[in-house]
């Protein structure tokens, strides 16, 4: 089978296109990393293009010891979500994590290109989430419009932000009962924001970067995108009300919901 016809490739390409159409992946915005299963790794190793291509090795400036030997599908630095479907061999790559480097074994235009600049944040988040859930597969970064807008209108405090979200819709506490993580504003890219995001990911599946976007993680594309959609939809409700929430679920009702579905003690 053509490597691009594998279901996880098709899902990744479809997700990128969807994010652009939703307005969450403008210009170079957005990136994703998908952890391949053992079965998927074996399929990739048996691909003829992979067999005949010598890996390109690039240095790794951070530690991800618990991911050594793991394979990831990654978007490239500078990729446009809008056009990934037109040239996936350039905009996507498969990498293998080593102790202090990564091997590009497929894609990125035969290893010429490089993984997203937020690759360190991605791998550190995978490492954090796998400790909480061994089935975690995906980390996505995007710029959901109303969620970003809400960070201008709401206090930058993750507990207060979470409680506001939970009050807006019964689905919120059911979809993210652990709450939402939030960082203060930080410089994006390869710096301190990566370890700080990963630290939040030890508890939360979504971490909001104020005035920028969010990182989200999950066990599948459906799981992760559904999580993002839920946050974004209710941020939109908040902004449509001008941040002036007079009614909504009470704290007791939120607790009742969570307990009814076995999410809280």
Predicted regions and their residues:
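Glycine-rich flexible loops
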Residues: 1-265
């Amino acid at each position: 089978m053509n490597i691009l016809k594998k279901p996880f490739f098709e899902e990744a390409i479809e997700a990128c296109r969807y994010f652009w159409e939703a307005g969450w992946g403008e210009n170079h915005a957005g990136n994703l990393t998908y952890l391949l299963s053992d079965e998927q790794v074996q399929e990739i190793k048996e691909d003829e293009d992979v067999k005949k291509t010598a890996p390109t090795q690039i240095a790794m400036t951070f530690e991800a010891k618990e991911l050594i030997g793991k394979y990831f599908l990654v978007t490239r630095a500078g990729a446009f979500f809008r056009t990934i479907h037109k040239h996936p061999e350039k905009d996507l790559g498969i990498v293998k994590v080593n102790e202090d480097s990564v091997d590009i074994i497929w894609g990125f235009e035969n290893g010429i290109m490089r993984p997203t600049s937020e690759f360190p944040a991605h791998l550190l988040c995978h490492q954090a989430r796998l400790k909480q859930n061994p089935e975690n597969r995906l980390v996505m970064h995007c710029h959901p419009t109303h969620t970003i807008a809400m960070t201008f209108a709401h206090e930058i405090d993750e507990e207060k932000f979470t409680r506001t979200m939970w009050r807006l819709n019964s689905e919120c506490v059911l979809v993210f009962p652990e709450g939402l993580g939030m960082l203060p504003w930080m410089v994006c890219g390869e710096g301190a924001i990566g370890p700080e995001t990963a630290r939040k990911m030890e508890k939360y599946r979504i971490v909001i970067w104020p005035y920028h976007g969010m990182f989200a993680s999950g066990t599948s594309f459906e799981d992760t995108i559904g999580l993002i959609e839920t946050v974004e939809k209710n941020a939109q409700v908040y902004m449509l009300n001008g941040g002036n929430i007079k009614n909504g679920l009470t704290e007791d009702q939120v607790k009742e919901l969570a307990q009814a579905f076995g999410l809280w003690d």
